[in-house]
């Protein structure tokens, strides 16, 4: 049976309240002053790029792959992250109801780009599913323990979160759209193993600091 939007919002509200209650934020160096965000983001981006440069130097000097020692390890990674990749960008869905408010324009732009800007072939979820299908991994995630679905459950809850959570959704988006070191290494090593890394390379391109999602966020 169809579930009403209000019922989804109520479930999302209680779920997210519980998640926030158990959130450990002590490790975060996130600035408390919004005026410091640009500097913080630039510093983080430079740090990631420096670490990636060091990684490339290690590899050029004969170091082994650091993420995927074998093809099977790469396959295992792909189907284990599938639950999260299959809801890529979902957290911004709740902002589409504010489509006529200029304050939400950049968020909605990110969302429609995640959907492929009207092209199903560019839809991020479809790209990832296509990758899994090409490798015969499309059904493996069905047997994963519940904890592998935790992150995707959070993103889907944000997708239906009521307006109370606008700051949390914006903050989640800001953090998620930063370019992480693990994405750069994953893209490099998958290509090295002959695995199509288009999905990951796409996120490196669109999440860039200068004019991509990281800047829009």
Name each model-derived stretch:
Residues 1-217:
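Non-heme di-metal
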């Amino acid at each position: 049976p169809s579930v009403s939007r209000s019922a989804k919002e109520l479930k999302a509200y209680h779920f997210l309240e519980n998640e926030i209650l158990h959130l450990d934020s002590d490790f975060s160096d996130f600035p408390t002053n919004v005026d410091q965000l640009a500097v913080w983001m630039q510093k983080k981006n430079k740090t990631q790029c420096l670490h990636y440069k060091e990684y490339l130097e290690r590899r050029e000097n004969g170091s082994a792959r650091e993420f995927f020692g074998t093809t099977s390890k790469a396959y295992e990674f792909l189907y284990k992250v599938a639950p999260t990749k299959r809801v890529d960008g979902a957290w911004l869905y709740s902002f589409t109801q504010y489509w006529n408010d200029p304050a939400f324009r950049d968020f909605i732009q990110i969302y429609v780009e995640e959907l492929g800007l009207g092209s199903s072939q560019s839809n991020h979820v479809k790209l990832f599913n296509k990758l899994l299908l090409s490798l015969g991994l499309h059904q493996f995630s069905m047997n994963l323990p519940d904890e592998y679905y935790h992150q995707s459950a959070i993103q889907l809850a944000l997708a239906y979160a009521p307006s109370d959570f606008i700051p949390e959704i914006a903050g989640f988006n800001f953090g998620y759209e930063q370019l992480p070191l693990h994405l750069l290494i994953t893209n490099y090593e998958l290509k090295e193993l002959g695995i199509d890394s288009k999905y990951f390379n796409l996120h490196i391109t669109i999440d860039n600091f200068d004019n991509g999602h990281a800047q829009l966020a």
